[in-house]
Amino acid sequence: MGAGGPRRGAGPPDGGWGWVVLGACFVITGFAYGFPKAVSVFFRELKRDFGAGYSDTAWVSSIMLAMLYGTGPLSSILVTRFGCRPVMLAGGLLASAGMILASFASRLLELYLTAGVLTGLGLALNFQPSLIMLGLYFERRRPLANGLAAAGSPVFLSTLSPLGQLLGERFGWRGGFLLFGGLLLHCCACGAVMRPPPGPQPRPDPAPPGGRARHRQLLDLAVCTDRTFMVYMVTKFLMALGLFVPAILLVNYAKDAGVPDAEAAFLLSIVGFVDIVARPACGALAGLGRLRPHVPYLFSLALLANGLTDLISARARSYGTLVAFCIAFGLSYGMVGALQFEVLMATVGAPRFPSALGLVLLVEAVAVLIGPPSAGRLVDALKNYEIIFYLAGSEVVLAGVFMAVTTYCCQRCSKDIPPGPSAEGGTSDTEDVEAERDSEPMPASTEEPGSLEALEVLSPRAGSPEPEEEAVPDLSHESVGGHEAHGQNA
């Protein structure tokens, strides 16, 4: 659908400008997940110039990842307050400025603050809003859209690392950081295309009779009262403890098994190539009519497959067995990447997705800071990769079993409650109150159109031929909250 005038009651376009938004989301996802790993190609030069150890230089990527995950609630607040496009533009500038300033660093601390904190924060302010906009533009094709967007991670990871190696050899790490900073300005271009979907102008929440209009929280913690959301949170925590460990240790594990360096490094390329194919394919599969209502179980199946792959391959020693492990791991890893945010969108709905995503990323940040570092310490202490693979696989299997069993129990418990109309086949626990409130008539609002009460908006009543007399500022129209009426269909 084109960007025509507002249409009353229109849902997500599922196409049109949404494909441009999907392309931008593909780029942002690639930068967010690929950039912290791509920076690691400069670590050898950083160690030489600063006289530091590997663990000291590795903190640059660690801080960047911690900012990407840990600032989720901050991103949610900013998106709810200002909208997706302004936050993404600011994030692109921050990410670029961080790398440019890092190219002039004379101490490791300066690298931590610039490339780590500033660039990590900038990537976080791009990643979360891009996923939110994707949910606003796609409903029927949303699983496919999520799979295609998630494919940006392996594509950029396999591209940025060789590019960084080339830039480092030709211009040094300072020149490489400077050019990477210019490359990150593409995040601003991606943010610029994030225009709101066509639809009615936003209207603020009404004031209760005889009182002031209700102030809605910028970070909606009420989503934590939803049982299915809490199940998802626990699943993501358990998953993040072990999901990334095999990929991190794979090359060293292969070398320990006697595989030559070049062939060991190629194993990661195999994982990346399979991952690129698996993500969009899994997204298309999850979008099929008969499978889409069961996406949480597909996610559980992907986790089980990934964990069992780790357990079965823990004793792999030959190169052929390791190649088979990489193919199976890349396939299951791609399935997890394609389904993780689709499950969250289906669980909480578009109106609560910004707050829910911020909380999930914060929980995942804690797990990421526990799992891989602990695995590294165990390897140093035990000199045994087999135990680490068993431990990581067990954690991921536990996450898959927990997701499947608790989802089934939640569905059984809610069978006696008649589901409300929803694109996903029902409403979550916390959406019923909102649906009941939204069905009431809209009285005149006493608040300014740009206030926080405009975060969740309603479509104009069918019997109202003319729009409100007050002009609504563009800032509110940009806000994700300004599209709740459309996002609820997601």
Curated annotation (Swiss-Prot):
Side of membrane Cytoplasmic, spans: 1-14, 80-85, 137-147, 194-230, 279-293, 340-352, 408-490
Extracellular side: 36-58, 107-115, 169-172, 252-257, 315-318, 374-386
Segments of this protein annotated with the region Basolateral sorting signal: 426-460, 461-480
A single GO cellular-component term on record: plasma membrane
GO molecular function terms attached to this record: lactate transmembrane transporter activity; monocarboxylic acid transmembrane transporter activity; secondary active monocarboxylate transmembrane transporter activity; symporter activity
Reaction catalysis annotation: (S)-lactate(in) + H(+)(in) = (S)-lactate(out) + H(+)(out)
UniProt protein name: Monocarboxylate transporter 3
Species annotation: Rattus norvegicus
